[in-house]
Amino acid sequence: MPHFVLDCSESILETHSEEQILEQVHMVANSTQLFKEGDIKVRVNPYKKYLVGNKKEDFIHVFANIMEGRSVEQKADLSKMMVQKLADMFPEIPNIAMNIREFEKATYCNRSMIKD
């Protein structure tokens, strides 16, 4: 972790490739120094069918899932940096947003934590 999942309208991929988007989201997350670089995971989910305010209007929304322990200020700065980078990349897209969800260390589990 952390996981950065970017939902977007498929048409934004005409401006920048998925690879470019993945790289830039990773770069912003890494630049905060809140996470180990090797732990950062990024995915892009382009949608063909969607509505924004009952209109087919391009959008980008980043969902960040991170382990608890960062301050509100750190999380707010991460969101602002990410939205700014995406706004710079996609100046024509009016709907760019991000939210951060924290999960508890006590309830998190991954395969490497399971004893054989």
Regions inferred by a protein language model and the residue ranges of each:
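A domain-level signal for the structural core that forms small-molecule/cofactor-binding pockets
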Residues: 2-116
